[in-house]
Amino acid sequence: MNDRATVTHLLQRLTAHLRVVYPDHDCEMLAERIVNLFWPDTSQMIKRRKIADKHLWDESDIVLITYGGSVRSKKERPLRTLHRFLKAHIGQTIGAVHILPFFPYSCDDGFGVIDYLEVDENLGEWSDIESIAEDYRLMADLVINHGSSKSKWFQQFLSDEAPGKDYYFTADPATDLGQVVRPRSHPLLTPFRTASGDRYVWSTFSTDQLDFDFSNPEVLIEFVKILAAYIDHGVRIFRLDAIAFLWKKIGTPSINLDETHEIIRLLRTLFDHHVETLIIITETNIPNHENLTYFGNQNEAHVIYNFSLPPLLTHALLTGNALYLKRLTRSNPPALAGCTYLNFTASHDGIGLRPTEGALPQGEVDQMLAAIQTFGGRVSMRRGPGGIEKPYEMNISYFEAMQGTLDGPDEYQVDRFMAAMAIMLALEGIPAIYIHSLLATANGYEEVNLTGHNRSINRRQLDYDRISEQLADASTVEAE
């Protein structure tokens, strides 16, 4: 049991976080609400805050990144097929599974969430998620920056009804927003006709993904409820999606703001007082020196993505020049106790180019882009300062990205691909392997044509029986 002193100390810590973010609100009351929502059963609260240490992971930890529907069978819903695939072909080789958003959604293959507390019925149900969590450490996304225009909250916004009417960040279209850092090229504000008139909603990623207004503490309260529910269903590792964009402030770049870091610290305080071992991973696809700030003082993320690795590793293997990759490995400081890097070559997104800023000369970037396009890849753009479009990411299957050099395709694709994976596995940190890298999947041109989105090239859905046959045949690339 937990004594009152434990709760009092926790309330004081939470109140301190909240006062930084919400100085004009009753932060003591907010802290009490958060504790009651996060710990409806106080037996799940530990008496003393966990001390950051190195016992959260070890050299055997590997994460598999997959969609709930990446492997399919006509016999059952996809989450059950995924679990069957894991047991048959992965076993205990990989200890953690990151299932990308498995909620009802309207866009972006899951990242436009309609209902945070339900499993997409086309994938399965909560019992399927819980079954996977019994066999593997489960990682899931908290899509915290934005939600779907089809959600109940946004429909309330359109109708000017509580609580959703105050959940979204809006701005006057006449406002100068030129300082805002953009990951996309569409207009930042999306107009909507609401019951109270025309309003312009901040939409960092698409017109169907509307940004929440965290200056309203009720939005934070909602996500505390969501976190508590995910923990109950077996999630232990939380990927904070697009977290760098969380707090918006007119007249600033609206990225990496102090309030964003403080909210992460608040979540870390909650996690550090929970009886379960809970891990925060921040998804911040930004230049490396900015990315490193998300460790905080061992009081923010436990793990940050090594976003600089995929583009610099790709560049090294396509050019034969490892200078820039070596600079990265030498410049990344050894992680402090309780912190580490998530190393990867590819994910469900493209190979990001923002981390190359200041790390790779533009001429080298241009050569790499040309090679990737030769290998069938695509290049997605973002809108930079002054409205100038810049390359944002390379969209390609990582196996296809390794098919040659700047001079074109050659016979060393498999060797080059295996070298990339070996380098990634050898670096300090936790390795993460995307399912389409594990299975050496080819570019999905049909998927791109179907969706109209470049990222679909590396988000194919595979037939369970076919992939099982390929893995059983030692002569196939998949088996290699």
Which residues make up each language-model segment?
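Active-site and adjacent substrate-binding regions of carbohydrate-active enzymes
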Residues: 2-480
